[in-house]
Amino acid sequence: MNNKILEQLEFNKVKELLLPYLKTEQSQEELLELEPMTEASKIEKSFNEISDMEQIFVEHHSFGIVSLSSISESLKRLELSADLNIQELLAIKKVLQSSSDMIHFYSDLDNVSFQSLDRLFENLEQFPNLQGSFQAINDGGFLEHFASPELERIRRQLTNSERRVRQILQDMLKEKAELLSENLIASRSGRSVLPVKNTYRNRISGVVHDISSSGSTVYIEPRAVVTLNEEITQLRADERHEEGRILHAFSDLLRPHVATIRNNAWILGHLDFVRAKYLFMSDNKATIPKISNDSTLALINVRHPLLSNPVANDLHFDHDLTAIVITGPNTGGKTIMLKTLGLAQLMGQSGLPVLADKGSKIAVFNNIFADIGDEQSIEQSLSTFSSHMTHIVSILNEADHNSLVLFDELGAGTDPQEGASLAMAILEHLRLSHIKTMATTHYPELKAYGIETNFVENASMEFDAETLSPTYRFMQGVPGRSNAFEIASRLGLAPFIVKQAKQMTDSDSDVNRIIEQLEAQTLETRRRLDHIKEVEQENLKFNRAVKKLYNEFSHERDKELEKIYQEAQEIVDMALNESDTILKKLNDKSQLKPHEIIDAKAQIKKLAPQVDLSKNKVLNKAKKIKAARAPRIGDDIIVTSYGQRGTLTSQLKDGRWEAQVGIIKMTLTHDEFTLVRVQEEQKVKNKQINVVKKADSSGPRARLDLRGKRYEEAMQELDHFIDQALLNNMGQVDIIHGIGTGVIREGVTKYLRRHKHVKHFAYAPQNAGGSGATIVTLG
């Protein structure tokens, strides 16, 4: 399609209306490149995507997508074997996380039936291993300590050295206060210094790094911290080097996946663009038009998108209709109507909602041409008429039966009689070529052409004779008429002059009366249609209200089910806590062994009645709610014992999970981690923040280290450890005894062999300690 029409109708300004709805740079780039399409299938696909998005908002009320920066240049740099900086890696991390969120969102969707968006969601890929590694980059664009063991070591040393320097300088601040111009530790060239009065500069030995502008203060690095500061400088250099190495490693991790990540980024941007189209449609009461296959146009209550308070009009351009000629005086809105048609077509063919009512229909044109406004070329010294005619000649040479042509004031700028004849000849040529045309004119001769010629229809813009102002209402089928006599009378022209003028135009009076009658009939028809539309709107509101009530009822029902489940869980927890309290009191007041308490606890559990709840519909529904929170590949987690964030990468056959935590892979059971998403939901509900930082050292340990212990001490600790593990229902524990002389190892083996609650034990794998550690299964 020719680009000139986009400029003439200010299509770029229409595209700017969607900018506030976009969240990603990728979608902004897509909007910038948006142009009208000429294939009906592609347009239909765009409309189907908006319909799918509408389903999401109707059923789920939102479609969350985070702000994402463009990563296209970063991916190109990766393809050129370049390493990315921390900000580029952070942008890619957000794309990976957003991809995972979208996959989970799609898997949780209910009550929707997509036509197009399902393919987009299904083409998204997630990278749990990469996501786990990228947990080492926080949202502030900073590498966490656990990014690598070396980085953690360097930063720990750096912190210790800086603390020692501060302590030494703090002591000197107290001891040498009278020698200092300020009681503070300053920094010069990255080294910690003291601000010493110039008169006492020889009282503190060290390196002078700076002098104040007045010369009264000398910034000295005391000799006591010179070595430490040099160590800090070296550690900072080591830190930068290690960070660079880590960034290089991250870049290498990404390189094999560039194409897939690029596709993910495009899909996320496109989903954001579709979301913006829907929100634009919703806010502006626009609609998704139907696509005709026979060049039929039907725009119901169509509005100009760039006007603040546009008047809605109906426009019908049937298949057989070739031309619509809008006649009547200037300033009535003829040009606006012309542009409204053109913009509605451009928006529709670009896959955008059209500012019209439901039931509207657009055609698909290969080209749209327009001659609108004064396009006189000053450089070529062309007159207005010559400029327009040059443009019209170009249009007639290029237009075909798949084109739409728009003419504003066709034939203007020359002798009225010749101009009218030219206008009719041009329209006749286009009619015979089956080219759809809309033209405005103020020549009365074209009214007769519209009445007498097949497949050509007159139209006009309504004028209010009472207020002497245009209403901007489009009246299709009614030719325009002059309102000169009415206006002159209302403005005070003598009645006899007006009467004489009417007598001079007797030949036209009958035509004007017919036009007046047509206008009255059109207004009556419009009033009836408006009433019908009001009834339709009331019905639509009623249907929406019913659907809203149903959704609210479903939501409240689900809340009640959740509440019932929580109350049942609380009852069970209270009973278990009460039994634990009883056992604790027994333990405190008697000489019972811990394993005897375990036996007693098992007997208490046997006392609980076994109730068959398999047919309980309420609890079954509650179980489904709980099951919805089961972990999935790609979920972000917190490893409870370490307080570290990671990502689930796969599930083993025995039910355990593999997780990527920084650069480390871990194997975890379900109770050794918590889902970040679930934690965040609980934080919102409880209005408090509980972040696991470190396992409580006073609680039961899953690992016992006996290295360096005496035999008797080791056996006592082992006995206590096993009892505590059994009390806390631990299924598996690790005992580290080392190899050494083998005395403690043999003692551990004998103890485990005779303990009735030890189901199985064996040495650890070679990569986990070998014969220096024993893995024990309890039961």
Curated annotation (Swiss-Prot):
InterPro entries: DNA_mismatch_repair_MutS_C (IPR000432), DNA_mismatch_repair_MutS_core (IPR007696), DNA_mismatch_repair_MutS_sf (IPR036187), MSSS (IPR046893), MutS (IPR045076), MutS2 (IPR005747), P-loop_NTPase (IPR027417), Smr_dom (IPR002625). This is Endonuclease MutS2. Belongs to the DNA mismatch repair MutS family. MutS2 subfamily. Endonuclease that is involved in the suppression of homologous recombination and thus may have a key role in the control of bacterial genetic diversity. Acts as a ribosome collision sensor, splitting the ribosome into its 2 subunits. Detects stalled/collided 70S ribosomes which it binds and splits by an ATP-hydrolysis driven conformational change. Acts upstream of the ribosome quality control system (RQC), a ribosome-associated complex that mediates the extraction of incompletely synthesized nascent chains from stalled ribosomes and their subsequent degradation. Probably generates substrates for RQC. CDD domains: ABC_MutS2. Pfam families: MSSS, MutS_V, Smr. PANTHER family: OS10G0509000 PROTEIN, OS10G0509000 PROTEIN-RELATED. It comes from Streptococcus pyogenes serotype M5 (strain Manfredo). GO terms for molecular function: ATP binding; ATP hydrolysis activity; ATP-dependent DNA damage sensor activity; endonuclease activity; mismatched DNA binding; ribosomal large subunit binding; rRNA binding. HAMAP family: MutS2 (MF_00092). GO terms for biological process: mismatch repair; negative regulation of DNA recombination; rescue of stalled ribosome. Homodimer. Binds to stalled ribosomes, contacting rRNA. It is an enzyme of class 3 (hydrolase). The lineage of its organism: Bacteria, Bacillati, Bacillota, Bacilli, Lactobacillales. SUPFAM superfamilies: DNA repair protein MutS, domain III (SSF48334), P-loop containing nucleoside triphosphate hydrolases (SSF52540), SMR domain-like (SSF160443). Keywords: ATP-binding, DNA-binding, Endonuclease, Hydrolase, Nuclease, Nucleotide-binding, RNA-binding, rRNA-binding. Its EC number is 3.1.-.-, 3.6.4.-. ATP binds at residues 328-335.
